């Protein structure tokens, strides 16, 4: 589909616009003339008239459908009305939805078909297949009035406001074109009928009002065009007529009930304006209500009604009384529920009327529910009488009873007897044509039956078909059969040229270039010239009208076949219902299975996700643990490096101090050597004493050196380091119980280092231990409670190390028993003080013993001084172990082999260093003694 744009002055084609797939039934142009909206049944499109290009397109669901889309006058708003009674307002530029009108009250809800808007765009009038008019206030966006037209108005076909130059666009007069062809103009405020145009005899098909409201152009049902002068129609309307509508109550602003909106119709008479004798315009003012006239004359009617009176009744009421529609009220027959699939008719209204008519025929007689060609037979009559289904039904019923006699005797086969009549007549009048049919195996079922079952609707135009049936209905029923023969005889030339069966089929199913008047004349000729023995009128009954009140019974068909088919159809229908029920059950079961499968799949997926999440979390935890272990390893490595560096620094400081002392000693020795050289001659006898004195002084210097070194660098530092190590071990044991084993090893290393230091530095540590005994006692006393609580954990750790301590278990048990005995004998600080005094005494004795051993046996016992010190250290250790310290025993006893090995290695290193120093001192002494002896011998020789 495409739209053409024409220039009104030059009448030339400007452009055409493509885009619609179905016919366009509405065009609305914007007040500026820049935009236009075209509407079809499935879409509405917005066009730019400057470029003739499509800007936007409104698509909707097929189940809804568009009723109308148009611009509001003097506004930039687009109003869209759909078939579900929804009305939306859109902004033209942005196409933003401004608002939606609410649904009308259910009690007065109608399907809107036609719309009209005042020139100021404030009031929207809507109507449809009802005698109600809805007036919407677009500013308040609510329904403010319902106008009820007279009862003779059954449907509203067109609405249009009458413009007025003095109402500022708020039009008050609304033109309403109803189904009876009369256009009534009413005042929407006073609800009075002003005037009307058209009549029942000369109905209006469509109408339009000039922009200034001076003229009304109407196309009549007979095709004529009438132009009315509004001024002439309203010259006596100033005398107000009695209202047709009684105002019950205007709508309050806060209510929307249909009872408050509705204005009810009352009977009345409108004064008719005087007609001008010169005027030939056929207009009528509203006469008294036809309802009252017909009701008053109802009992005065004779036994029958003529055609003119029936037409008056039909135009006045729009339908016949209800008692004649009993067949229609039975609903759609089951045989025609899917009629649209076999006969896809574009017009839904026509399809609906055809379906209802066929259903009425099927309800009338069972045979028609199984007649396959019934839709083809009834379709032309349905299309002709689509606005009155009762007439359509009765015409078809009359046709079947009279012109379709004996058609159903051979059901479900074609009427062979009727076709034989046609063939006999054709054989009599045109033997050559019949012989041509016989030669090409063309039977009457091909050249006669297609024309009968479609009643010539496929081969004739509308006008030709109407002309033909005017003659058929006006003659004997045999006239229809003669028409078939006449049609073949008039078409003998093209038929004689056909040689293929497909050509014959095409010919009898399509229109041909044939004059229907010639055919009709030929039919009349055949009716007159056909012999009586083969004439169909001798075998067909004369015309019989339908009975009054109820329709006649139609049973001219093989009842057993129809009953059998009906039973089979019912059986098949029941089987289909059973099958559908079973299929529905299976589908329900399948749906449940699918749902269960989906739920199971979802559950499995959820479990899989949970498992993956758990694995991810576990991997993350493992990674974190690995990182923590690596960090701990790095921290331990850093600690080891720091300790090694500390030891190296201590060793370097000690070496520097020793070197300084050695240098000082060498300087002193050189000074002594010089002094001895000067006095050698004077003190020969004092050489031995001087040598001893020098040795003693050397020992004193060595002891002073060690004391100074220990006092300055290690005494306080060792004690502070010991206390810090103990405090750190205590805090680490409390905060990180899971790392007790590593901390225990560190505590063991610290204790081992302290033990080694005590072994190597007995003298200095003894003095400092006397000063810090109380401090250690207090710290150990605080740790006692926690040590008791963690004793259980230590025992569990001890189980893992018992295999490494099998050789020490007897010593540990003895120490534990000794500790238990001493714990019971004394408590608290007294035992600690006694232990401290004992340790001090042992330290003094050890110091005296050490000095004595160094002086008397420096050379003989220098190689294994540690063997002499070990018993003393063990005694001191036993004394110190008597303190109330359970953790000390456990720490010293629960060291692993690696810790013991590291302690032994350090002890060996300390022993090696001590031996080296002692060896160096011994060599120095030997050298000094040798020098002294050499000088002494030289002096004796000189003296001699």
Swiss-Prot record:
It comes from the Eukaryota. Pfam families: RabGAP-TBC (PF00566), WD40 (PF00400). InterPro entries: Rab-GAP-TBC_dom, Rab-GAP_TBC_sf, TBC1_cilium_biogenesis, WD40/YVTN_repeat-like_dom_sf, WD40_repeat_dom_sf, WD40_rpt. The keyword Coiled coil applies. GO terms for cellular component: centriolar satellite; centrosome; ciliary basal body; cytoplasm. Residues 931-934 are annotated as: Mediates direct interaction with PJA2. Gene3D superfamilies: Ypt/Rab-GAP domain of gyp1p, domain 3 (1.10.472.80), YVTN repeat-like/Quinoprotein amine dehydrogenase (2.130.10.10). GO terms for molecular function: molecular adaptor activity. Residues 300-476 form the Rab-GAP TBC domain. Residues 262-281, 865-900 are annotated as: Disordered. Residues 883-900 have a biased composition (Polar residues). WD repeats lie at residues 12-52, 53-95, 96-143, 144-191, 192-229. Keywords: Cell projection, Cilium biogenesis/degradation, Coiled coil, Cytoplasm, Cytoskeleton, Repeat, WD repeat. SMART domains: WD40 (SM00320). Residues 605-735, 791-825 form a coiled coil. The keyword Coiled coil applies. Interacts with PJA2; the interaction is direct and recruits PJA2 to centrosomes. Interacts with OFD1; regulates its activity in cilium assembly. Interacts with PRKACA. Molecular adapter which is involved in cilium biogenesis. Part of a functional complex including OFD1 a centriolar protein involved in cilium assembly. Could regulate the cAMP-dependent phosphorylation of OFD1, and its subsequent ubiquitination by PJA2 which ultimately leads to its proteasomal degradation. PANTHER family: TBC1 DOMAIN FAMILY MEMBER 31, WD REPEAT CONTAINING PROTEIN 3 WDR3. This is TBC1 domain family member 31. It comes from Pongo abelii (Sumatran orangutan).
């Amino acid at each position: 589909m495409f739209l053409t744009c024409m220039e009104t002055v030059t009448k030339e084609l400007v452009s055409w616009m493509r885009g619609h797939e179905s016919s366009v039934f509405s065009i609305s142009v914007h007040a500026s003339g820049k935009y236009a909206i075209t509407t079809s049944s499935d879409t509405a499109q917005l066009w730019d008239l400057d470029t003739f290009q499509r800007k936007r397109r409104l698509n909707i669901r097929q189940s809804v459908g568009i009723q109308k889309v148009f611009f509001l006058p003097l506004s930039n708003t687009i109003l869209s009305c759909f078939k579900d009674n929804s009305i939306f307002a859109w902004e033209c530029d942005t196409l933003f939805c401004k608002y939606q009108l609410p649904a009308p009250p259910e009690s007065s809800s109608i399907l809107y078909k036609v719309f009209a808007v005042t020139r100021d765009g404030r009031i929207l009038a809507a109507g449809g297949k009802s005698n109600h008019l809805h007036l919407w206030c677009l500013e308040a966006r609510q329904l403010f009035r319902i106008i009820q037209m007279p009862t003779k108005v059954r449907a509203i076909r067109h609405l249009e406001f009458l413009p007025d130059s003095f109402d500022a666009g708020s039009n008050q007069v609304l033109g309403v074109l109803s189904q009876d062809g009369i256009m009534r103009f009413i005042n929407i405020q006073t609800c009075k009928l002003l005037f009307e145009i058209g009549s029942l005899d000369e109905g209006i098909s469509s109408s339009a009002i000039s922009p200034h409201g001076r003229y009304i152009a109407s196309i009549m049902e007979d095709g004529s065009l009438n132009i009315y002068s509004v001024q002439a129609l309203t010259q006596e309307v100033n005398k107000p007529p009695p209202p047709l509508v009684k105002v019950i109550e205007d709508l309050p602003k806060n209510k929307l009930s249909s009872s408050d909106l509705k204005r009810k119709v009352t009977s009345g008479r409108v004064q008719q304006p005087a007609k001008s004798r010169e005027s030939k315009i056929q207009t009528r003012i509203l006469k008294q209500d036809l309802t009252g006239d017909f009701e008053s004359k109802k009992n005065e009617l004779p036994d029958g009604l003529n055609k003119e009176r029936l037409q008056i009744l039909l135009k006045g009421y729009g339908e016949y009384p209800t008692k004649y529609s009993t067949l229609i009220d039975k609903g759609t027959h089951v045989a025609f529920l899917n009629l649209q699939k076999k006969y896809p008719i574009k017009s839904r209204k026509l399809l609906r009327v055809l379906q209802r008519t066929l259903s009425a025929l099927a309800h009338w007689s069972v045979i028609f529910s199984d007649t396959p060609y019934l839709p083809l037979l009834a379709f032309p009559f349905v299309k002709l009488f689509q606005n009155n289904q009762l007439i359509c039904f009765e015409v078809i019923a009359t046709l079947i009873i009279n012109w379709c006699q004996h058609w159903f005797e051979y059901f479900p086969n074609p009427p062979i007897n009727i076709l034989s009549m046609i063939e006999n007549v054709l054989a009599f009048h045109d033997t050559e044509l019949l012989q041509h049919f016989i030669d090409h195996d063309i039977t009457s079922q091909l050249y006669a039956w297609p024309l009968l079952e479609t009643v010539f609707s496929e081969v004739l135009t509308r006008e030709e078909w109407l002309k033909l049936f005017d003659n058929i209905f006006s003659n004997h029923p045999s006239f229809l059969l003669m028409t078939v023969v006449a049609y073949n005889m008039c078409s003998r030339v093209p038929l004689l040229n056909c040689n293929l069966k497909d050509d014959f089929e095409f010919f009898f199913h399509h229109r041909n270039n044939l004059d229907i008047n010639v055919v009709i004349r030929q039919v009349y000729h055949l009716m007159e010239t056909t012999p009586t023995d083969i004439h169909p009128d001798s075998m067909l009954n004369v015309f019989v009208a339908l009975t009054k009140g109820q329709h006649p019974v139609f049973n001219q068909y093989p009842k057993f076949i129809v009953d059998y088919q009906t039973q089979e159809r019912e059986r098949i229908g029941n089987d289909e219902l059973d099958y559908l029920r079973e299929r529905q059950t299976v589908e329900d079961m399948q749906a449940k299975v699918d749902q269960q499968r989906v739920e199971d799949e979802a559950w499995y997926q959820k479990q899989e996700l949970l498992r993956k999440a758990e694995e991810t979390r576990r991997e993350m935890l493992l990674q974190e643990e690995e990182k923590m272990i690596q960090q701990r390893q790095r921290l331990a490595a850093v600690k080891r490096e720091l300790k090694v560096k500390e030891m190296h620094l201590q060793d370097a400081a000690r070496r520097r101090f020793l070197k300084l002392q050695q240098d000082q000693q060498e300087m002193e020795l050189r000074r002594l050597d010089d002094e001895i050289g000067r006095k050698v001659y004077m003190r020969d006898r004092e050489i031995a004493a001087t040598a001893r004195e020098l040795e003693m002084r050397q020992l004193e210097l060595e002891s002073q050196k060690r004391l100074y070194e220990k006092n300055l660098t290690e005494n306080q530092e060792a004690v502070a380091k010991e206390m810090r190590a103990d405090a750190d071990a205590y805090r680490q044991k409390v905060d990180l119980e899971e790392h007790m084993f590593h901390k225990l090893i560190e505590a063991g290393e610290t204790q081992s280092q302290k033990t080694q230091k005590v072994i190597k530095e007995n003298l200095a540590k003894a003095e400092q231990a006397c000063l810090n005994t109380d401090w250690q006692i207090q710290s150990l006393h605080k740790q006692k409670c926690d040590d008791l609580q963690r004793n259980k954990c230590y025992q569990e750790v001890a189980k893992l190390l018992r295999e490494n301590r099998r050789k020490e278990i007897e010593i540990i048990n003895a120490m534990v028993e000794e500790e238990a005995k001493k714990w019971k004998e004394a408590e608290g600080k007294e035992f600690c003080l006694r232990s401290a005094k004992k340790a001090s005494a042992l330290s003094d004795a050890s110091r005296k013993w050490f000095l004595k051993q160094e002086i008397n046996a420096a050379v003989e016992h220098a190689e294994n001084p540690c063997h002499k010190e070990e018993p003393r250290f063990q005694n001191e250790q036993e004394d110190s172990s008597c303190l109330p310290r359970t953790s000390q025993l456990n720490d010293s006893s629960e060291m692993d082999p690696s810790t013991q090995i590291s302690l032994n290695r350090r002890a060996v290193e300390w022993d090696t260093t001590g031996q080296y120093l002692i060896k160096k001192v011994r060599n120095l002494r030997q050298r000094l003694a040798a020098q002294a002896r050499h000088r002494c011998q030289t002096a004796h020789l000189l003296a001699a």
